[in-house]
């Protein structure tokens, strides 16, 4: 069976009509907006349907749309090797309750992607087996990829600017 976007969308709408919030297509790629509480059902259907067979979770990531509600989005990219077809699932996540169900039961490879998204954005994946920080130190406060994180940082010294940088640094004198 040759898969195309209308076929995939029609199968999803027929099987889980109340789970979908909308869809869009950009440069031939299908994106489907899913209710957060139904992401596991939609992902399981896409994986287990004998005609669709989206057996591979390529990646998932977080996006911060500061000033919009829902503020965050978790984006999942799935691939059907059998049909050579991709689909993108998008789940809006509220700033007040930044949580979405984990997909680690369906794809164990989601483990590190979810931990990274938690670490960088503070989105909690409920049901995750070990949602600890993965990139930042345990005592780090906040989530560095949120757009409201202060950017006050020390300028890095390179060969082109080291004289200017080092002129203001107190160095130990021997």
Swiss-Prot record:
A Gene Ontology molecular function term of the record: NADH:ubiquinone reductase (non-electrogenic) activity
* UniProt keyword Transferase present: no
Q: What is its main location?
A: membrane
Question: Would the keyword NAD turn up in this protein's UniProt record?
Answer: yes
Membrane topology per record:
Peripheral membrane protein
Q: Which UniProt keywords apply?
A: Cell membrane, Membrane, NAD, Quinone, Translocase, Transport, Ubiquinone
**What is annotated about its quaternary structure and interactions?**
NDH-1 is composed of 14 different subunits. Subunits NuoB, C, D, E, F, and G constitute the peripheral sector of the complex.
> This protein is called what?
NADH-quinone oxidoreductase subunit C
**Lineage of the species this protein comes from:** Bacteria, Bacillati, Chloroflexota, Chloroflexia, Chloroflexales
